Amino acid sequence: MSNLPFTVAALYCFAPLPQYESLREPLAQLCCANGIKGTLLLAAEGINGTVAGSAGAIEKLIAHITAIPGLGEPELKYSHASEMPFHRMKVRLKREIVTMGVEGIDPLKSVGTYIVPKDWNALIADENTVVVDTRNDYEYAIGTFEGAIDPQTRTFRAFPEWVKQNRDRLEGKKIAMFCTGGIRCEKATAFVKGLGFDDVYHLKGGILKYLEEVPREQSMWNGECFVFDERVAVGHGLAESDVELCRACRRPLTPQDKLSQFFEEGVSCAGCYAERTPEDRARYAERQKQVKLAEKRGANKHIGS
């Protein structure tokens, strides 16, 4: 049982929701009434999101979601935070609950074989297994599994094209895929199976469940796991990390990254310095100045974030 005041719930469920638009307002009202913040995505294919609040508030929300007709029990990962990791609550209507951009991909019809965390090490240690990180390059940069391939994608939409261009690396192998909480792998494995690959596996519950259940001394995970909230990243046991965001480009920064000559808080980092003009950096510097002034006054500290 954590002593930290905020419970963070990452959840998803693929299920036919033909009337998903009607679910938006009741969810938004429940979250607002109970002080819950974060993002929930609704689409005809299901629900996805990460939210935070008191333990009791999150319990109410999960009960509400589970009771939605046709939805059932969502895939859930819990962690905890010392501060509220979101600034506001958003319930959005989308075409997909995780955007791959490939028509006809349905994890309810075809998906890879789930591998629970305790069995994951044996699979990825097998010399006939190719391990694929389905996340984006900035996520891979701060942590991944031993021997994992980095597809070097900036968005999940780019992943299908990477697979097509790298079929020769996957042929005749066991294909083990992983992502943060499992949802991207639902579609990634469905897509790969649709190309004719049979030995396709994915980590059930994603990296978050692995870090929660597998002891550090047995772990094959190196680094931190990027999360899409103000905690930025978590480590073994889902402990908060010392990784921060570059507020100019939103890349994750380790303490080592902040030693770069190109790092200036709120203005630039080694990853984005060359991508920005002097005018951009001057604008970011002024924004950072306003952030610091707001913090001194005790105002919101997420200006421009």
UniProtKB/Swiss-Prot annotation:
GO terms for molecular function: oxidoreductase activity, acting on paired donors, with incorporation or reduction of molecular oxygen. The active site is at residue 179. It holds the Pfam family UPF0176_N. Disulfide bonds: none annotated. Keywords: Oxidoreductase, tRNA processing. The keyword Translocase does not apply. InterPro entries: Rhodanese-like_dom (IPR001763), Rhodanese-like_dom_sf (IPR036873), TrhO (IPR020936), TRHO_N (IPR040503). Its EC number is 1.14.-.-. Catalyzes oxygen-dependent 5-hydroxyuridine (ho5U) modification at position 34 in tRNAs. NCBIfam families: PRK00142.1-4. This is tRNA uridine(34) hydroxylase. It comes from Brucella suis (strain ATCC 23445 / NCTC 10510). The gene is trhO.
